[in-house]
């Protein structure tokens, strides 16, 4: 009886380990034109999220949620959090998120709200 219980526990532990190992890790890359891949020949292949996905391989699913000219600042001229891509990134329910926002926040019309940057980032 003792051997059966130990065997069952061992089987459960191995099953959990194997199941955990098969889980694909989802990565959402959010950001501005740099994330989107502006300036590359083929953003679907050459943007940093695409290259990251190629480098990480099969155990990872990397999606690009970049939108050109977007800001972190909610009072900025094009706030990322008001975009459909932001809602899609949330719905994706990623395990890891990379954020590349801030470049467009330094434009004069946006930087006047710099005191809100930390609050908007939270």
Q: Where are the predicted features?
A:
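Amphipathic, positively biased hydrophobic alpha-helical segments used for protein targeting
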Residues: 9-11, 18, 42-44, 48-50, ...
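Serine-esterase "nucleophile elbow" of acetyl-processing enzymes
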Residues: 19-67, 86-91
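A generic signature of intrinsically disordered, low-complexity regions enriched in glycine/proline
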Residues: 7, 36, 50, 108-109
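Alpha-helical cap/lid subdomain in secreted, periplasmic
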Residues: 2, 21-22, 54, 77-122
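Acidic/histidine-rich helix-loop elements
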Residues: 37-44, 64-81, 107, 111-115
């Amino acid at each position: 009886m003792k051997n059966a219980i130990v065997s069952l526990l061992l089987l459960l532990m191995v099953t959990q380990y194997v199941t955990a190992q098969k889980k694909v890790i989802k990565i959402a890359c959010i950001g501005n034109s740099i994330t989107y891949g502006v300036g590359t020949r083929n953003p679907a292949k050459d943007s940093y999220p695409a290259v990251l996905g190629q480098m990480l391989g099969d155990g990872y699913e990397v999606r690009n949620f970049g939108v050109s000219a977007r800001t972190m600042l909610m009072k900025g001229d094009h706030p990322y959090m008001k975009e459909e891509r932001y809602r899609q990134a949330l719905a994706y329910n990623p395990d890891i998120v990379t954020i590349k926002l801030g470049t467009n926040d330094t434009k004069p019309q946006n930087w006047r709200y710099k005191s809100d940057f930390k609050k908007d980032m939270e």
